[in-house]
Amino acid sequence: MSIQNEMPGYNDVYQLLNQQGVGLTPAEMHGLISGLLCGGNTDSSWQPLVHDLTNEGLAFGHELAQALRNMHSAISDSLDDDGFLFQLYLPEGDAVSVFDRADALAGWVNHFLLGLGVSQPKLDKVKDETGEAIDDLRNIAQLGYDEDEDQEELEMSLEEIIEYVRVAALLCHDTFARQQPTAPEVRKPTLH
C-alpha cells in the first residue's frame, strides 16, 4: 500500500469529526465506508452518500474530507489485496478499555450494515453463506456485555468476534463487489 493510501490516525479522525459536529466515531465512519465498498459502491457516489447519511447532506470541510478520502482509498486498497490487509478500525492502546472496544465494534458493525444496505437494497433476500454472515452481523450489532465479567475473558472473546466480523465483511465484498468472471462472448457466425 502506498503512503498516500495509509489509514489516517484514529484520534486525528476523531478530532476532525468532532470539529465538524459529525455525530459518528471513527470506527462508525470506517464501518460505513467499508459497508459501501463491500456492497459494491466503487465510484465517487460514496461521498454524497456519506454526506447524506452523516451530515444532513452537507459536504465536509477540507481536512475531514481529505482524511475520509484517504480512509476510503486505504479501505479499497486493503479489500482489493484479497482482503489480507483489511482490518476493522477500532480504538487501541492502554487507555482504551475492553468495554470501549466492544462499544466501538458494535458501532462499526451497525454502520457497516447501513453502508451495505444502501449499496445492496435487497440485503434481506441474500441467502447462503453471505446471508448467514449478514444475520450474524445483525446479532453482533446488538452486542452487550456485563461490566462485572472477567476482562481478560471478554478481551479474548472480543478478539474472536472482531476476526469473525472481518471475515464476514470480506465475504460480503466477495459476494457484492468482486467482478464475477463472465462467460466468453459467443459470436454468431457471419454470413458473407
From Swiss-Prot:
Pfam families in the cross-refs: UPF0149
Upper lineage: Bacteria, Pseudomonadati, Pseudomonadota, Gammaproteobacteria, Enterobacterales
UniProt cross-references to NCBIfam families, sorted A to Z: PRK01736.1, ygfB_yecA
Name of the protein: UPF0149 protein KPN78578_32810
Family classification: Belongs to the UPF0149 family.
Gene Ontology cellular-component annotations: cytosol
HAMAP family in the cross-refs: UPF0149 (MF_00346)
Organism: Klebsiella pneumoniae subsp. pneumoniae (strain ATCC 700721 / MGH 78578)
